[in-house]
Amino acid sequence: MRKNGFVVMGHLLKLVTPLAHIMAFTITMGTLGFLAAIFIMVLGATGLVNLLNFDTHLSFSGILTALIVLAVARGALRYLEQMSGHYIAFKLLALLRDKVFSSLRRLAFVKLQDKQAGQLVSLVTNDIELLEVFYAHTIAPIMIAFFTSAILLLVFAQLSSWFVLVALAAYLTVGVILPIITTKLAREDGRRYRELVGEMNDFFLDSVRGMKEIQLFGYAKQRLDEIQQRSQKIDTAFERIKDQEAKVRVYTEVAVSVFNIIMLFTGLILFSLDKIDFAAFLIGVILLMSSYGPVIALSNLSSNLLQTLASGERVLSLLAEEPELKDVESAVDLKDVSRIDVENVNFAYGEEQILSDVSLSVKKGEILGIHGRSGSGKSTLLKLLMRFYDPKSGSIKINGETLPNINTCSLRDNMAYITQQTYIFNETIEENIRLARRDATLEEIMEAAKKASIHDFILSLPQGYQTKMTELGGNLSDGEKQRIGIARAFLHNAPIILLDEPTSNLDSLNEAMILKSLLNVKAEKLIILVSHRQSTMAICDQVIGIENGRMS
């Protein structure tokens, strides 16, 4: 559901609360800085009036001194405003990145299955980076424009009430009406541009990962053509945004010129009617002409906000997204796992029934085998045991406690889950295995690798355990990746081991070694082994079959 721009800004503003005192400092420095710049022009006009022999009650030397002081102050105030404003921006960007990563952890595993990697990369990098525009160049300028304009209207009030009306109309038109109109007209362009960039990132990432297949099947030219087509769409969307920015500048310049002319004629009329003297006339006109800086900054914001609000909406949507299941924190901790009982479990993905009335029991010291064809629901049952999902009906108990009554962290700490695909990080082999237990020694890692029948292979590499992995483990075969995943499970040393097709990519020799390792640790573990291989099922104490979601 699309959020209103003001709603997005409101949510983004809430994040500033811890740094409100620094934001107040930024606004103060910015307001004083603009006033210093404006009054340099006003004092210059006052000096001109003095030269024309009109009495302004100020000496020429006093005006010159004030001009020098204001010029120096303007530089210092501008520096302090920019420094504090960008401190807030980058502090909040770091906070947002932390929140986004925490949100991704919270949404894993279930919700992230439906999200494209390229879109997430675009969000974590480009979208968050674009929010710097909002925090450093939007919040403070809005408040600075408000306070500066309010102070200047008080100054205009000392000259003429008509000047106040003209200045108020000018500030509202340039700083409020024009930005609102242009933002509404072009907001969809900014959102569409961010979506196209995210889609392009995803498409390009997909192309890089599938480069071998693209070359093998002669699909390179078509893929390149599609990249060019997508790039053209991005260019078109970007051109629309730039066209909008140009229109905003034109509208702003026209509005400024019109109100300058109105102020000039208003001053001339008042002067001709002896309502104001020449000094008030000249100061009033120059004051308005030199005071557009803060409100023009607001007008220019509208074009930048088109992309910023679209990025903010994407980030906020991710932060607000709820996980499939919330982690349980104030419940039972698992200790001395002795048995798992699955009782009359039914589960469906949407309308598609996956498991129907499944029941089983397995005790510590046993290996339970689950056999069945691909798509029969075997892997889904393991995900239910990990509590990635809850069953639609029935229950799953560990030591007599249902999973919703067990602390999620404790549940996961007591389980080692080996999936069909092992993800390899761009780190050394040692660090890839250590992922299972961060405080593990090299000796413990090597022992786990021996159990997983991968130790000898690692030692055969030039750098051994310090061998750096390429992206996605491109320098390993599928079987080698799988054995590293199994080594992680052995290192984790959890009392419950869940294995989903652990030997599917292994030859018979390595399969036998892995199965022997499982038998060696069987007495202290509760093992559930999913496989379609009859040879793997041979080590199991009991085997159940699942066919079309039902026990057979």
From Swiss-Prot:
Q: Which GO terms describe its molecular function?
A: ABC-type transporter activity; ATP binding; ATP hydrolysis activity; ATPase-coupled transmembrane transporter activity
Tell me where it mainly resides. membrane
Q: Tell me, what's a Pfam family for it?
A: ABC_tran
- The cysteines joined by S-S bonds are none
Coiled-coil stretches = none
Keywords on this record?
A: ATP-binding, Cell inner membrane, Cell membrane, Membrane, Nucleotide-binding, Transmembrane, Transmembrane helix, Transport
Spans through the membrane: 22-42, 52-72, 139-159, 162-182, 253-273, 278-298
Q: Per the UniProt entry, what is one GO biological process?
A: cell redox homeostasis
The record's listing under InterPro entries reads: AAA+_ATPase, ABC1_TM_dom, ABC1_TM_sf, ABC_CydC/D, ABC_transporter-like_ATP-bd, P-loop_NTPase, Type_1_exporter
PROSITE patterns tied to this protein? ABC_TM1F (PS50929), ABC_TRANSPORTER_2 (PS50893)
Q: Where in the cell is it found?
A: Cell inner membrane
Ranges of residues in domain ABC transporter: 340-552
Q: Where is the ABC transmembrane type-1 domain?
A: 23-307
Q: Which SMART domains match?
A: AAA
What does the record say about its membrane topology? Answer: Multi-pass membrane protein
- Annotated binding of ATP, by residue: G372, R373, S374, G375, S376, G377, K378, S379
Output a single Gene Ontology CC term carried by this record: plasma membrane
PANTHER family from the xrefs? Answer: ATP-BINDING CASSETTE SUB-FAMILY B (PTHR24221), TRANSPORT ATP-BINDING PROTEIN CYDC (PTHR24221:SF653)
Which family would the database say this protein is a member of? Answer: Belongs to the ABC transporter superfamily. Lipid exporter (TC 3.A.1.106) family.
Q: What is this protein called?
A: Probable ABC transporter ATP-binding/permease protein HI_0664
Q: Which organism is it from?
A: Haemophilus influenzae (strain ATCC 51907 / DSM 11121 / KW20 / Rd)
